[in-house]
Amino acid sequence: RLAPEYEAAATRYGVSGYPTLKDGEEAGAYDGPRTADGIVSHLKFISDKDASVVGFFRDLFSDGHSEFLKFAHTNVESLVKEYDDNGEGITLFRPSHLANKFEDKDLLTAYYDVDYEKKTFSHELSDFGLESTTGEVPVVAIRFVMQEEFSRFLQDYFDGNLKRYLKSEPIPETNDGPVKMDATANDVPSPYEVKGFPTIYFSPANKK
């Protein structure tokens, strides 16, 4: 017979057989092998520091759910509502040590330890109006050129306080000839796309 405090816990969590293994308030009962090796294997799985992928499904007999059973799944209503408004989907859960203060922000790609003198990267600086590599260059650029400390630059970017850099030649003193531009020295405005040279677009006079 269980001690009173354990009997209350067993009643609260619906424990009717032994051994029963539960993890968390909303977790379902462990339904794996009722052996020491099976339980240890399950505990190692849920305590592993690697990222976890959890599937949410409306239909427990769908092809997607059947395939996902090879990994992990849940149909606990509260969890489904908390992590997926549509009631179905796959969610990646990462350990907290991988989180940072810039989560849920724009995707940032940073180049570092790059030799801009090499041909492969020589055009990267010119795209941001930085033609010389002899002096200091920004740590990062996100269509904006960094002017100061890195974290402040990122915060200003996320707050929308940065002025976007557009590669552009000086305005010509005279511009009475055919409309033309050097796509290697200027950012091409939308909706035009340049994939080769020469590229010609026709815009009717009444649809500029």
Swiss-Prot record:
EC number(s) reported in the record: 5.3.4.1
Molecular-function annotations in GO: protein disulfide isomerase activity
Any single Gene Ontology cellular-component annotation: melanosome
Modified residues (N6-succinyllysine): 44
Compartment list: Endoplasmic reticulum; Endoplasmic reticulum lumen; Melanosome
UniProt main location, coarse: endoplasmic reticulum
Entry PTM: Within the major histocompatibility complex class I (MHC I) peptide loading complex forms reversible disulfide-linked heterodimers with TAPBP as part of its protein folding chaperone activity. This is essential to assist the dynamic assembly of the MHC I complex with high affinity antigens in the endoplasmic reticulum.
Tissue: In the caput epididymal spermatozoa, detected in the mid-peice and at low levels in the principal piece. In the cauda epididymal spermatozoa, detected at very low levels in the principal piece and not in the mid-piece (at protein level).
Residues carrying the site annotation Lowers pKa of C-terminal Cys of first active site: 34
Sequence ranges assigned to domain Thioredoxin in this UniProt record: 1-44, 151-208
Disulfide bonds, paired cysteine numbers: none
Coiled coil stretches, renumbered: none
Family: Belongs to the protein disulfide isomerase family.
Protein name: Protein disulfide-isomerase A3
Organism encoding this protein: Mesocricetus auratus
Gene: PDIA3
